[in-house]
């Protein structure tokens, strides 16, 4: 499970699973050195068959994160189904987690960030350095070339 990027990274990998949480491996998975995986109490994290995550990635599940079969992730990727900390409003904790679902045969470029509530369609390629902050589940499967503008358009 701790393969990939042989000799490139020396950081320690942390895999923290809290009580009453679930981690599902549906086949072989590789999570490279220097990565941090945290599955909070009551959360579910599932990996499809032939999942590969390169070095220095961060996956934090408060509710649900799922990766489809043959998903490939580059270096230094962050996947969060939450805001990173609780938000209090009028003395009460507000629910801030939304599921993240990444389809089969997806390729996520290095330095990308996938935030809460995102659904990524099967066959999608996320370019280097992108922040995906809303549901792109409807994207065409050939996300290269002229389709690149779909992600960048809200920021231009």
Model regions and ranges:
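Glycine-rich NAD(P)-binding loop of Rossmann-like domains
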Residues: 92-103
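Active-site/ligand-binding-proximal alpha/beta "capping" segment
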Residues: 101, 119, 128-129, 133-134
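Short basic coil micro-motifs at the edges of alpha-helical modules that engage polyanionic partners
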Residues: 56, 97-99, 117
């Amino acid at each position: 499970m701790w393969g990939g990027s042989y000799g490139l990274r020396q950081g320690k990998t942390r895999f923290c699973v809290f009580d009453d949480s679930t981690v599902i491996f549906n086949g072989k998975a590789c999570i490279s050195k220097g990565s941090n995986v945290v599955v909070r109490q009551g959360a579910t994290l599932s990996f499809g068959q032939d999942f590969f995550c390169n070095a220095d990635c961060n996956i934090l599940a408060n509710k649900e994160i799922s990766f489809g079969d043959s998903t490939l992730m580059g270096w230094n990727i962050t996947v969060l189904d939450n805001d990173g900390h609780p938000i209090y409003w009028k003395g009460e904790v507000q629910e801030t987690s939304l599921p993240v679902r990444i389809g089969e045969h997806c390729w996520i470029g290095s330095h990308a960030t996938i935030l809460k509530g995102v659904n990524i369609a099967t066959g999608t390629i996320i370019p280097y350095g992108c922040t995906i902050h809303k549901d792109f589940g409807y994207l065409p499967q050939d996300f290269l070339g002229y389709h690149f503008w779909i992600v960048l358009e809200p920021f231009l």
